[in-house]
Amino acid sequence: FFATSIQADGWIPNITIGGNNGDEDYTAYGATFLFTPNDRFEALLTVESMDDQSALKAYNQNFNVAPGVIAPPPPGPNTTDFSGGLLACTIYPQACRTSPDQLGYAENDTQHDASVKTDAITLNMSYELNDNLTVKYIFGYRDVTEDRIYDYDGSAAPFITLERWNVYDQTSHEIQLNGSYNNVEFTAGLYMFEKEFEQDWATG
């Protein structure tokens, strides 16, 4: 049996909604079972579950800069000049970034909530046919559900948010024939992989 738990407060203060960005809340647990009825056969089964409710650590910086924050680029045919500031600062001047320095705080007005849950099953079975040949079967299953929201612009202004809901199922089967004869070793087999993915994204 194994288990892991990680709990931590956020690491960067948020001056718009309070608290800190980047808190961690992760738990995982599982068990492994070994079955060896004789010297030729072995089965190893692992069942585990992971639950990650940690907030997203990305998109912590506001890049809606005011006029004069970014210097004009050198002359050239493929340059973009942001020295006049961004349009967002005209609409929401209170949400403008006024310094090019790395900020010691976050300004996003939407908390970066996230949830990722994973259930997993792995099975390995092997049987020795003789001293030279071994048959092996490997099974894997993953069930993942994900829900997260980003404050994409990272500012105090009510601009772009992106919310994602994903559901992912994966199943795999593998059969191997492993051989070893003097100086020759080989592996032959079949592999099947099946997955199903559902995605629902919304912007606001």
Give each language-model segment a name.
Residues 35-40, 80, 130, 137:
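Short, structured coil/loop segments at alpha-helix boundaries
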Residues 42-102, 107-116, 158-166, 195-204:
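Flexible loop and strand-edge segments within Gram-negative outer membrane beta-barrel domains
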Residues 110-111, 122-124:
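Generic recognition of flexible, low-complexity loop/linker segments
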